[in-house]
């Protein structure tokens, strides 16, 4: 039994799916509270309309990189919103250069061998290295692990509108920590702001219509080596436990300083963690540059367009159905996913599946 139904739509960023047309705004609902016959009738009609659309939501996903906490790390934040700009789900992780005793992101060894990263350093996910990083936090007086803090901030943001979260930007960091009482990070305000930015990015992306209980959906994310050893992939999946409802792909590679690096790239170079002349860069953020290199190799689609094509293929499919692609050849998978032309399409699908199964 499927937990819900995903209906793929052609609506772009900012458009509204037809299935949501019966929904009314909170402002409209408030105006029906007047004690007149006409207002009471309108209130009844509003209730009926809401009942008709109950369990149906238009969902979009977006992702950003941010400098939410100082200059020694950067965050990657993902957010899913509905047609009312409410955060349905969010996900925070942060990446910092640590010693090689800790667990680095995929292809860390290759990054060191190429000279892009210092030999004694690895770029590491704070969630993956939760125990190590949280021990350092404990010495500084923290009472909660870093992963637990990230989860608490996510829980606070989920269910709130973009506008509601933006109101925190006018408060002091201390006031925000007090407001998000379940989290103890002094830079809580920065993480909430990053969720807002990810949600705004989602507004520009295409939507799917989900017919089911959105409260049952979970947003999960992993790092993977989906394409060779010169980069690493971040794959996100919104799932109801059976299907991939929405997905998001981006990939990060060390490029020259002529390109757009992740936040705090200058600090990473100054510390010696990253080689001079190099920046870690999002392929989506550097779509034009990276796609020009692909074009020289014979590609007919930009990298972002390819990622979007894979996402569109995956969205709405059962996890079990997607797992079957692991038994096919890379060429067969490329043929099946006609919306993408990447030779490693199979690897990207596998990364989304792995995220969904977390």
Set out the residue ranges of the language-model regions.
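C-terminal motif of bacterial Sec signal peptides marking the signal peptidase cleavage site
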Residues: 6-10
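Extracellular mucin-like PTS domains
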Residues: 19-51
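Active-site- and interface-proximal helix/loop "cap" or "latch" segments in soluble metabolic
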Residues: 55-61, 65-219, 226-358
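Sec-dependent N-terminal signal peptides
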Residues: 1-3, 13
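Bacterial lipoprotein signal-peptidase II cleavage site
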Residues: 11-21
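Low-complexity, intrinsically disordered short peptide segments enriched in small/polar/basic residues
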Residues: 3-4, 50, 242, 276
